[in-house]
């Protein structure tokens, strides 16, 4: 499989923010880091972006879409936006410190 080439601008569009939750930080024991990504991002784009921005080797990318909840605002129902997350597994010996700025 050929390596996907994307622009620097698209890399920073794909990796929006790290997810800092108890469940996401438990994945660090298994060399996993979780990021928020756009709904149209593909696994190969996510892999290329993480490798390009952080300079690490990615072995796997798993994605999930969390559906937006129905909430009420001023008595009227509304829907929160859907959120796509990517769980990125890094190669042996590689790590990303998400607590520091990029």
From Swiss-Prot:
Ribosomal protein as UniProt keyword: yes
Protein name as annotated: Large ribosomal subunit protein uL23
Keyword Calcium: no
GO terms of biological process kind: translation
Gene3D superfamilies, per database record: 3.30.70.330
Keywords for this protein: Ribonucleoprotein, Ribosomal protein, RNA-binding, rRNA-binding
Record-annotated membrane-spanning stretches: none
Subunit details: Part of the 50S ribosomal subunit. Contacts protein L29, and trigger factor when it is bound to the ribosome.
């Amino acid at each position: 499989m050929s390596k996907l080439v994307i622009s620097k601008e698209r890399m920073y569009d794909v990796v929006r923010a790290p997810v800092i939750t108890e469940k996401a930080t438990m994945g660090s024991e298994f060399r996993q880091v979780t990021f928020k990504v756009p709904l149209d991002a593909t696994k190969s784009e996510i892999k290329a972006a993480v490798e390009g921005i952080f300079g690490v080797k990615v072995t796997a990318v798993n994605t999930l879409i969390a559906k937006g909840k129905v909430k009420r605002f001023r008595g009227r129902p509304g829907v929160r936006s859907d959120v796509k997350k990517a769980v990125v597994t890094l190669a042996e010996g590689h790590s990303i410190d998400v607590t520091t700025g990029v």
